[in-house]
Amino acid sequence: LEGLRYYDDYVKEGRYVNDREFTHFSHTFHELQGMTWGILGLGAIGRRVADIAGMFGAKVIYYSASGASAQEGYCQADFDTLLKESDILSVHAPLNQYTEGLMDQKAFHKMKSSAIFLNLGRGPIVREADLVKALNEGEIQAAGLDVLSGEPMAADSPFLSVKDKSRLLITPHVAWAAVEARQRLMKIIAGQIKDFFKL
């Protein structure tokens, strides 16, 4: 996404007007084809992400922190393999005794220096100071977060000390918040209330 910001600025600042070629090649990016997309938590959401990554040609591997049995269609890996092989690692797991603090300094140290880390699960799965250290020391390439340990973000959040801000993208817990998703949630809650009171 940071690349999109670069290209948008490039065009809107008038620099594209002066290009000699129809395409701007100076800022590179890569396809998902041939990359390994690791998923921590292959539940309903993780499986949808796996399906999409697979459609774009990525090899998908996953790790189940709870030790759940293998999911058909995708390669189950141990945690070390997930960390070492993933070009992109996305978290979709719930917070529980198996996942709290799982992504710590030791875990980030095992990842590729070119890896992108995404947390779309729960904030406390990540030791935030360890992620900041991994970004600042180049142990991973970039991170995208939709969840934090404390929400809204604290004024003294360690994420504010990331040296290269372009390597970290944070959204305010909105991955779930599409209008349609909220409408579905309200219908589910209404149905559960009716069931409880036998209405």
Regions found by a protein language model. Give the residues of each.
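Short clusters of hydrophobic/aromatic residues that line enzyme substrate/ligand-binding pockets
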Residues: 16, 102-103, 153, 159
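Short, flexible loop segments at the rims of nucleotide/cofactor-binding pockets, characterized by
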Residues: 16-17, 67-72, 94-97, 121, ...
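Rossmann-like dinucleotide-binding domain for NAD(H)/NADP(H)
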Residues: 114-116, 120-199
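Phosphate-binding beta-alpha-beta segment of Rossmann-like dinucleotide-binding domains, i.e.
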Residues: 1-36
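Conserved functional loop/turn residues at catalytic and ligand-binding sites
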Residues: 15, 36, 41, 87, ...
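Short, cationic motifs built from Arg/Lys/His that form the positively charged side of catalytic pockets
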Residues: 2-6, 52, 107, 112, ...
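Oxidoreductase and adenylate-handling cofactor-binding alpha/beta cores
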Residues: 1-9, 35, 52-58, 190-195
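Rossmann-like dinucleotide/phosphate-binding beta-alpha-beta segment
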Residues: 23-113
